[in-house]
């Protein structure tokens, strides 16, 4: 979803409070401001569904401090960042000779072997199984001895050499040599019960955002892993209908802890791989959590190897307002990992929860004696603090009414980070460098490189940060460049999307306006995607596109081609989004405003913002709609159920309808427990079902996939039942065997076509 936007402030006669430079007009309505004289075609629904216009990316893989791999025309090329020359690392003919289509590849750190991934089968958001072959780069042939089993869940090279660790059937195996047999590390794995080295559903989705729960030490001496026990976790069950020839549907069962339910338990172990041999038993040493979290339910939420014999674990209480970093050292004489209270660092939130979605990871100096971490300062903004490992207090090295998004690289002299400081725009991202011996010496490395085109960056650094790739995502066409850290010089353009630029000159594209409105004495950001040749003297239908979950951000300077592009370009609909209370990257005061009260302020603010939009003079207040997906579907439904009279219709896709139906980690982070002693009243007051009667005043389309493992079909089923019981006339659409993304090819086309028809009917469009 990529859109060529022109960012306009104050275009509509509204005072612009900050300056945003527009992207080149070539991306927009080049040639005329007269709609009647513009004969170019618009961006159509078919363009979106068929991806007629494709953005090019440049995904590189650093393998040293000056070299990276890049796949081009099925050749794997090795590039030298310093000189710009390249050589073929692996020919495309090698892939042809395999006899199967590969999904991915991974080169061993010593460059002797390459791992080919194929037979990819998706499981949940991050997890999948696959088959793997190992290719010997010296002999130029596949290794056929002691092959890795099919349906492997995860596999990873050691950081040096070519040892492999992998997970199969929820147990961990290590290969010291690719052609030798594997050594089994664990024996307790059991489907849906015990997970070794991979995450269960809730840890994958809400804690690690990953399937892997394996961590090699820097030199590959030790292998750390987590074990999750879901014995007491209740199962969610749903039917999977599969092919029509199946007489009885399959039943999918997933351990899924809902709010207030039994959670998985977690243990953490370290194995010394030097002791592995075919005839020896394997000893895994368990590191127990600190007593302050061990006293109750808790989560493992971060693992960082500091040195070869020092590891940092981060734990958090179930309430998620108290976390602790525990730094443990290896005692060679006993083979134990020793924790010390002096090396424990506590982080507490008194206004909400720790971190954004989880506590930030620590970034350690090379000697392992100190680290940098993003935490909230006294004013409630996320900034970088410098900790000594044996001291509890820290020194903030950044400050201001803006937030650090992430630490990108750390050297002996500098720390590189992404923030939204530039021009006070929460929806921007730029790369900064701070000098570690003088925190006042801060340089923005990206702010002035291409200010019209690029205001939203990410970065990828080489192994020791000698070089970095800058990835510009908007507001103009995406741009990928390579830079030297020593001079900050741009070495070369990797991808500029010039071909797409040329194609879009023949299309009438929308423009994008970012500005602020005032609610409750606070300035909040909104964006509007405006039709081509926008005329403020005319009246346009308005669609609010909402998410509004905790720490969300819908207003940004990212380039997208999306459903909204079609609606604005072809149907002349204004598509607006608004970040109100509860949204992220603007300080804890705004983000924590909805703490323990989901479904309140973030819903009210969408209604009030829309009221203000309707008074701007160019909105047809009789044709206002709202739509959202997931949390956005929840907010859409709560807004429509509020009976405000502002909205004519709305679409909710895969919505939450009752927080007691959603998973424990996410829900309890913001709502606490659904018990009388804790927060049961707010749980009960935040259901969509309780607002069913008010849906008689609006047109409502409810959509859900029957195989949604995340927001279960139960949520829409119970909401539908409540609407029927209230005598509400509404529309609904389900997608058989589709998960939360409803992303299979035909379902994707069907849902957006169906929503388009619904919206055009609501707005009385031809």
Swiss-Prot record:
Known glycosylation sites: 85, 92, 150, 179, 219, 229, 279, 321, 685
Q: Which residues form the signal peptide?
A: none
Q: Which Pfam families match?
A: DPPIV_N (PF00930), DPPIV_rep (PF18811), Peptidase_S9 (PF00326)
Q: In the UniProt entry, which residues are flagged as the active site?
A: 630 (charge relay system), 708 (charge relay system), 740 (charge relay system)
List the membrane topology term(s).
Single-pass type II membrane protein
Catalytic function, reaction form? Release of an N-terminal dipeptide, Xaa-Yaa-|-Zaa-, from a polypeptide, preferentially when Yaa is Pro, provided Zaa is neither Pro nor hydroxyproline
Query: How is this chain modified after translation?
Result: The soluble form (Dipeptidyl peptidase 4 soluble form also named SDPP) derives from the membrane form (Dipeptidyl peptidase 4 membrane form also named MDPP) by proteolytic processing.
All ranges on the Cytoplasmic side of the membrane? 1-6
- Transmembrane region(s): 7-27
Q: What is its main location?
A: membrane
GO terms classed as biological process: behavioral fear response; cell adhesion; endothelial cell migration; locomotory exploration behavior; negative regulation of extracellular matrix disassembly; negative regulation of neutrophil chemotaxis; positive regulation of cell population proliferation; proteolysis
Sum up the protein's function in the record's words: Cell surface glycoprotein receptor involved in the costimulatory signal essential for T-cell receptor (TCR)-mediated T-cell activation. Acts as a positive regulator of T-cell coactivation, by binding at least ADA, CAV1, IGF2R, and PTPRC. Its binding to CAV1 and CARD11 induces T-cell proliferation and NF-kappa-B activation in a T-cell receptor/CD3-dependent manner. Its interaction with ADA also regulates lymphocyte-epithelial cell adhesion.
Q: How does it assemble?
A: Monomer. Homodimer. Heterodimer with Seprase (FAP). Requires homodimerization for optimal dipeptidyl peptidase activity and T-cell costimulation. Found in a membrane raft complex, at least composed of BCL10, CARD11, DPP4 and IKBKB. Associates with collagen. Interacts with PTPRC; the interaction is enhanced in an interleukin-12-dependent manner in activated lymphocytes. Interacts (via extracellular domain) with ADA; does not inhibit its dipeptidyl peptidase activity. Interacts with CAV1 (via the N-terminus); the interaction is direct.
Q: What organism does the UniProt record list as the source?
A: Sus scrofa (Pig)
Subcellular localization(s) per the UniProt record: Cell membrane; Apical cell membrane; Cell projection, Invadopodium membrane; Cell projection, Lamellipodium membrane
Superkingdom classification of source: Eukaryota
Q: Name one GO molecular function term.
A: aminopeptidase activity
Membership in a protein family: Belongs to the peptidase S9B family. DPPIV subfamily.
What Enzyme Commission number(s) appear in the record?
3.4.14.5
Protein known as? Dipeptidyl peptidase 4
Residue pairs linked by disulfide bridges in the UniProt entry: 385-394, 444-447, 454-472, 649-762
Its Gene Ontology cellular component terms are:
apical plasma membrane; cell surface; endocytic vesicle; extracellular region; intercellular canaliculus; lamellipodium; lamellipodium membrane; membrane raft
Q: Which gene encodes it?
A: DPP4
**Residues in the Extracellular compartment per record:** 28-766
| PROSITE patterns membership | PRO_ENDOPEP_SER
Description of activity control? Inhibited by GPC3 and diprotin A.
Q: Keywords of this protein's UniProt record, alphabetized? A: Aminopeptidase, Cell adhesion, Cell junction, Cell membrane, Cell projection, Disulfide bond, Glycoprotein, Hydrolase, Membrane, Protease, Secreted, Serine protease, Signal-anchor, Transmembrane, Transmembrane helix
């Amino acid at each position: 979803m990529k859109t060529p936007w022109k960012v306009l402030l104050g275009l509509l006669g509204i005072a612009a409070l900050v300056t945003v430079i527009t992207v080149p007009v070539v991306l927009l309505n080049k040639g005329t401001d007269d709609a009647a004289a513009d004969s170019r075609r618009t961006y159509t629904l078919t363009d979106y569904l068929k991806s007629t216009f494709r953005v090019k990316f440049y995904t590189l893989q650093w393998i040293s401090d000056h070299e990276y791999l890049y796949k081009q025309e099925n050749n794997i090329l090795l590039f030298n960042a310093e000189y710009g020359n390249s050589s073929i690392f692996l020919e495309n003919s090698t892939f042809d000779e395999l006899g199967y289509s590969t999904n991915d590849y991974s080169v061993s750190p010593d460059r002797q072997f390459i791992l080919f991934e194929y037979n990819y089968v998706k499981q949940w958001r991050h997890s999948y199984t696959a088959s793997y072959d190992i290719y010997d780069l010296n002999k130029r042939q596949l290794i056929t001895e002691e092959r890795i089993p099919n349906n492997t869940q995860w596999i990873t090279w050691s950081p040096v050499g070519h040892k492999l660790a992998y997970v199969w059937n929820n147990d961990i195996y290590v290969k010291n040599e690719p052609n030798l047999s594997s050594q089994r590390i664990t024996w307790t794995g059991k489907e849906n019960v015990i997970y070794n080295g991979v995450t269960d559903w809730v840890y994958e989705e809400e804690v690690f955002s990953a399937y892997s729960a394996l961590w090699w030490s820097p030199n590959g001496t030790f292998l750390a892993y987590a074990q999750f026990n879901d014995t007491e976790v209740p199962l969610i069950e749903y039917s999977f209908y599969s092919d029509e020839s199946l007489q009885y549907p399959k039943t999918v069962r997933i351990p899924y802890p809902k709010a207030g339910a039994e959670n998985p338990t977690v243990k953490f172990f370290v194995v010394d791989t030097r002791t592995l041999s075919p005839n020896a038993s394997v000893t895994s040493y368990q590191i127990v959590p600190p007593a302050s979290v061990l006293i109750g339910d808790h989560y493992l939420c971060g693992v960082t190897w500091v040195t070869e014999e020092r590891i940092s674990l981060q734990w958090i209480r179930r309430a998620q307002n108290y976390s602790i970093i525990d730094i443990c050292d290896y005692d060679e004489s006993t083979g134990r990992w020793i924790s010390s209270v002096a090396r424990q660092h506590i982080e507490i939130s008194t206004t909400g929860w720790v971190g954004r979605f989880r506590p930030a990871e620590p970034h350690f100096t090379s000697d392992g004696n100190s680290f940098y971490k993003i935490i909230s300062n006294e004013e409630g903004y996320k900034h970088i603090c410098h900790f000594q490992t044996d001291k509890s207090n820290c020194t903030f090295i950044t400050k201001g009414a803006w937030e650090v998004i992430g630490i990108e690289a750390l050297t002996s002299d500098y720390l590189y980070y992404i923030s939204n400081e530039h021009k006070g725009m929460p929806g921007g991202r730029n790369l900064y460098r701070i000098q570690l011996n003088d925190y006042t010496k801060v340089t923005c490395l990206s702010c002035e490189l291409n200010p019209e085109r690029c205001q939203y960056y990410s970065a990828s650094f080489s192994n020791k940060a000698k070089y970095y790739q800058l990835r510009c995502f908007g507001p103009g066409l995406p741009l990928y460049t390579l830079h030297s850290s020593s001079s900050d010089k741009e070495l070369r353009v990797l991808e500029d999307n010039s071909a797409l630029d040329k194609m879009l000159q023949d299309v009438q594209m929308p423009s994008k306006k970012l500005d602020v409105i005032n609610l409750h004495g606070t300035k909040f950001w909104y964006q509007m995607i405006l039709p081509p040749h926008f005329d403020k003297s005319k009246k346009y239908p308005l669609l609010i596109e909402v998410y509004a979950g905790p720490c969300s951000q819908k207003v940004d300077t990212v380039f997208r081609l999306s459903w909204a592009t079609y609606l604005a370009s072809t149907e002349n609909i204004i598509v607006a989004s608004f970040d109100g209370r509860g949204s992220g990257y603007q300080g804890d005061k705004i983000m924590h405003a909805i703490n323990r009260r989901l479904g309140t302020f973030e819903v009210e603010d969408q209604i009030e913002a829309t009221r203000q939009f309707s008074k701007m003079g160019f909105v047809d207040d009789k044709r206002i709609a709202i739509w959202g997906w997931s949390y956005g579907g929840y907010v859409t439904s709560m807004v429509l159920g509020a009976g405000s009279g502002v909205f004519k219709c709305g679409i909710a896709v895969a919505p939450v309808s009752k927080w007691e139906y959603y998973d424990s980690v996410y829900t309890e982070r913001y709502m606490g427990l659904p018990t009388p002693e804790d927060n049961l009243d707010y749980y009960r007051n935040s259901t969509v079902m309780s607002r069913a009667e008010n849906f008689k005043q609006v047109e409502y389309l409810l959509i859900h996939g029957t195989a949604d493992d995340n927001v279960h079909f139960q949520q829409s089923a119970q909401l539908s039942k409540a609407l029927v019981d209230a005598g509400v006339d509404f529309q609904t659409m389900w997608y058989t065997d589709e998960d939360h993304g409803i992303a299979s090819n035909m379902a994707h086309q069907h849902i957006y076509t169906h929503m388009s028809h619904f919206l055009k009917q609501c707005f009385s469009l031809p």
